[in-house]
């Protein structure tokens, strides 16, 4: 990143949910999570892959994280700690947490390093909890946003959060891809905007070219909030994968982080 942006400021976002399987213990290992997954869900994932003739992975390949070690499960405090250390070894100006208030260790380490810390919020109550935890700014992320998002639209959410947190800076997020939307967010009281999905189609993004093209061709009706990727509602492009998990006669997606562990290799096969 620093090779690309030079001395310009940049930020890093991590995901440590407020609630997830094993959160009371700081997160479970991949092996323990894998042991909790019902056989019916494994069978269903295999049925989907067979239905669409998705090729097997090579023996030397694996998904986003290794299933052969006993490391911390994804999207947990156990994985965020090392990620934070790597981030702070560089020069991000801002570290942001999603799906809950940043853990205290994150706030302490970021502030000790002289950086700012923020958090995404889908409700005014979430924003208030973030401020009480000690964050420096709030990202008010509306229903329209890509990725993990709540159920309140940006037009309503942004002013609610601005009013709730008073003097804490608020960035508006969710459905912001043009200057008009940026102007609207700032008219609602936000001091700036936070964009995510719009960057996935840039030349610098690592997004697969096929996915980039699908995103560029998509309309506002071509997305869905689905738990099929992470176990929590996340907006993504509609696909055969999301269609299969929306079928009421099939198993419901598991919670986080069981669902990511369940589909780890499957997503790698699909992306290939």
Question: Model features per residue range: what roles?
Answer:
Residues 99, 173-174:
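Glycine-rich Rossmann-fold phosphate-binding loop(s) that bind the pyrophosphate
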């Amino acid at each position: 990143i620093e090779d690309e942006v030079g001395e310009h400021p940049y930020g890093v976002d991590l995901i440590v949910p407020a609630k997830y399987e094993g959160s009371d213990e700081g997160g479970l290992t991949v092996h323990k999570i894998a042991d909790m997954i019902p056989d019916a869900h494994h069978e269903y994932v295999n049925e989907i892959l067979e239905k669409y003739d998705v090729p097997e992975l090579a023996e030397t390949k694996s998904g986003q994280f290794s299933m052969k070690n006993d490391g911390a499960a994804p999207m947990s405090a156990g994985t965020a700690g090392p990620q934070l250390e790597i981030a702070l070894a560089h020069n991000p100006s801002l570290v942001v947490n999603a799906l809950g208030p940043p853990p205290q260790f994150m706030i302490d380490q970021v502030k000790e390093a002289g950086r700012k810390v923020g958090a995404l919020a889908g409700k005014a109550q979430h924003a208030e909890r973030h401020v009480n935890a000690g964050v420096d700014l709030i990202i008010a992320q509306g229903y329209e946003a890509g990725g993990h998002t709540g159920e309140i639209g940006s037009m309503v959410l942004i002013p609610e959060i601005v009013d709730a947190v008073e003097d804490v800076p608020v960035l508006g997020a969710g459905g912001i891809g043009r200057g008009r939307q940026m102007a609207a967010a700032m008219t609602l009281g936000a001091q700036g905007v936070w964009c995510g999905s719009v960057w996935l189609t840039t030349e610098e993004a690592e997004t697969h070219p096929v996915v980039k093209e699908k995103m560029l061709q998509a309309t506002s009706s071509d997305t869905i909030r689905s738990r099929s990727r992470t176990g929590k509602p996340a907006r993504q492009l509609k696909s055969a994968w999301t269609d299969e998990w929306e079928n009421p006669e099939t198993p419901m997606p598991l919670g986080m982080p069981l669902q990511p562990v369940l589909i780890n290799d499957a997503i790698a096969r699909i992306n290939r």
